[in-house]
Amino acid sequence: MRTPITNVNWLEHHEIMDELLYHEASLTTHPMDDGFEAEVLKINLDQESYVLKTWSKSSKPDVQFQYRLLDVLSERGVAVSKPVGWGINPDGNKVLLTSFDGTPIHKVNNKTMKELASILARIHQIDIAELEHIQLPKYDFIDYFFPEVREHTDLNQAVISLVEQTPMRQDRIIHGDFHLGNIVEEQQRFTVIDWTNGQLGDPRYDFAWSFILLKIHISERYADMFRSAYLLDNFMEQEELEVFEAWACLRWILLNRRGSTPKGPNVSKRVKSILGSNRFLKDLDFQGFK
């Protein structure tokens, strides 16, 4: 029986790939929920499971970089999936095979928030000198996280105002989209997945994005627990916190206007509350969000 891994031109892989190909007749596959960017398939062999991501949609990230990044992070004990291999399938789409590390988090508590904050803090503490051989990408902050913002006059004016008040750093590895949807759990062990946005960036923004998403979509109480736990490991001044929370809120509004944010009860109310309490945003007039 031929499987989705059979006809792939595997450009880099670990030894376990040879075993999977040797036992391909025994492999079973099960579809998983696709993300915005890729098709996702679970592959099983005996008691072991793996995840195959195929970038068949419009997004075409650097999969080789993801593979190598996961390799060095997993070697250092960071809570990421172990990469098995990456390559190109017969349709010309890039694929990545990794370990299967659990299912999405459905319930959170104080302990969960503290552990996730500790994981993110540890990622931000990695010495990038150890990762030089994988050439971490560095992008223009506005172009990357605020694409097409110039088409929104109100947001663009706010961005221009914040740029003047934010000495931006790009000296740490960041995940770029650290939230509950990109974390899985198995037997109380958390794993950070989807490193499409991994890059050299400002850890203060990376943290603020996670914090704002928790505040908007989960609860202020759990968001504050996450913040307190993170700041124990990576201290930030109050003004830094506020300015990067402003950046994160502006990005949320931009994504919301593009239809890329989850809907839920009280979401608009929470966003308005954040805008009203942030000194960098409270006097600005926004045209609304869905």
Regions found by a protein language model. Name each.
Residues R204-M236, A248-K263:
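Active-site activation/catalytic loop segments of kinase-like enzymes and analogous catalytic loops
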Residues K42-I43, T54, G85, S99-F100, ...:
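Conserved hydrophobic "DFG−1" position in protein kinase catalytic cores
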Residues E39-N44, V51, I160-Y205:
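Active-site acidic catalytic loop and adjacent metal/ATP-binding pocket
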Residues Y22-L45:
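ATP-binding glycine-rich phosphate-binding loop
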Residues L254-K290:
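ATP/Mg2+ or Mg2+-diphosphate-binding catalytic cores
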Residues T103-N110, E130-L131, H217:
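Short, polar/flexible loop-turn hinges at active-site or ligand-entry regions and domain interfaces
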Residues T6-H23, I128-G176, L180-E186, L275-K290:
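An alpha-helical support segment within catalytic cores of ATP-dependent transferases
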Residues S49-L96, P104-Q125:
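A conserved alpha-helical element in kinase catalytic cores
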